[in-house]
From Swiss-Prot:
This is Actin CyI, cytoplasmic. It is found in: Cytoplasm, Cytoskeleton. The modification N-acetylaspartate is found at D3. The lineage of its organism: Eukaryota, Metazoa, Echinodermata, Eleutherozoa, Echinozoa. It is an enzyme of class 3 (hydrolase).
Length: 376
């Protein structure tokens, strides 16, 4: 399937980033922000060829004159007109393909409303004339990418986190838990605690700088209290960061205080269990006979699990919650930022999967509800 002329397309639509490419590839070819920007003011320069909307990186670079919107909130599509623009941009500008010539595999958040899957299906067949399509659950794809069919996936991106127990390739919906705490919240919290230190970050442009600081310098402490006292008594944990204007700032305990809120959401003023406890609660909602398999196959996925130290901390916290003799294994694949996409690439290129596609003909006969019968 490495022939681009017939290869299936794989599109993973996240709250923060779209990952798109061809089935059979080992990484997405296009990764760009899930944003649509519209000009705030009427164009004054005649003949400048100003567009009525911009998508992705172009919207990001012109953000000074645009109003930016994210059509995917907390992993779920809330604005279909903008979503259509993002898909159009993906096909024609990023991948440069004719959508009517390629089957397309889309991803969806766990517990995505039924109406949403139908709408996705409808847009693919009616707007883009896809020959075939399929909708797969993001966490299930991450598990496939790790070479497993049973396990529990903790998937955390920019807009939402989920714990998804999966048995023999099927997600167990009654045990899926959602946590509205993810990358964007960590960036906001880092902005807040850096502001308390006297550095001012307020605009959306400055938020991007803070996101970069987060990605480059933050880590998860194995023992938070001990790390705090180390940070207070010496400067060994301090790192410097150069802002775009050349000013250099120093960041100390903020490096691990921001990601700590994954384990202690009370830092963000949220009354919710941390990611370790949510994972444990999710396992406890499953049948007692499969828990052992879940503990031994806990897979991390998504950009917000990229912090150094997160796997060791997760191991420590879940060990403390689980029965004393239980074998616990946290799997943190190095490519986990893109593991949903990679899993989609693997799935769409399997010979056994080819009969699973929803074809245009099936859609014409049954309508959008076909998606519930063929994709689960």
């Amino acid at each position: 399937m490495c022939d681009d002329d017939v290869a299936a397309l794989v599109i993973d639509n996240g709250s923060g980033m779209v990952k798109a490419g061809f089935a059979g590839d080992d990484a997405p070819r296009a990764v760009f922000p899930s944003i649509v920007g519209r000009p705030r003011h009427q164009g004054v320069m005649v003949g400048m060829g100003q567009k009525d909307s911009y998508v992705g990186d172009e919207a990001q670079s012109k953000r000074g004159i645009l109003t930016l919107k994210y059509p995917i909130e907390h992993g779920i599509v809330t604005n279909w007109d903008d979503m259509e623009k993002i898909w159009h941009h993906t096909f024609y500008n990023e991948l440069r393909v004719a959508p009517e010539e390629h089957p397309v595999l889309l991803t969806e958040a766990p517990l995505n409303p039924k109406a949403n899957r139908e709408k996705m299906t409808q847009i693919m067949f009616e707007t883009f004339n896809s020959p075939a399509m399929y909708v797969a659950i993001q966490a299930v794809l991450s598990l496939y990418a790790s070479g497993r069919t049973t396990g529990i996936v903790f998937d955390s991106g920019d807009g939402v986190s989920h714990t998804v127990p999966i048995y023999e390739g099927y997600a167990l919906p009654h045990a899926i838990l959602r946590l509205d705490l993810a990358g964007r919240d960590l960036t906001d919290y880092l902005m807040k605690i850096l502001t308390e230190r006297g550095y001012s970050f307020t605009t959306t442009a400055e938020r991007e700088i803070v996101r970069d600081i987060k990605e480059k310098l933050c880590y998860v402490a194995l023992d938070f209290e001990q790390e705090m006292s180390t940070a207070a008594s010496s400067s060994s944990l301090e790192k410097s960061y150069e802002l775009p204007d050349g000013q250099v700032i120093t960041i100390g305990n903020e490096r691990f205080r921001a990601p700590e809120s994954l384990f202690q959401p009370s830092f963000l003023g949220m009354e919710s269990a941390g990611i370790h406890e949510t994972t444990y609660n999710s396992i406890m909602k499953c049948d007692v006979d499969i828990r052992k398999d879940l503990y031994a196959n806990t897979v991390l996925s998504g950009g917000s699990t990229m912090f150094p130290g997160i796997a060791d901390r997760m191991q420590k916290e879940i060990t403390a919650l689980a029965p004393p003799t239980m074998k616990i294994k946290i799997i943190a694949p190095p490519e986990r930022k893109y593991s949903v996409w990679i899993g989609g690439s693997i799935l769409a290129s399997l010979s056994t999967f080819q009969q699973m596609w929803i074809s245009k003909q099936e859609y014409d006969e049954s309508g959008p509800s076909i998606v519930h019968r063929k994709c689960f």
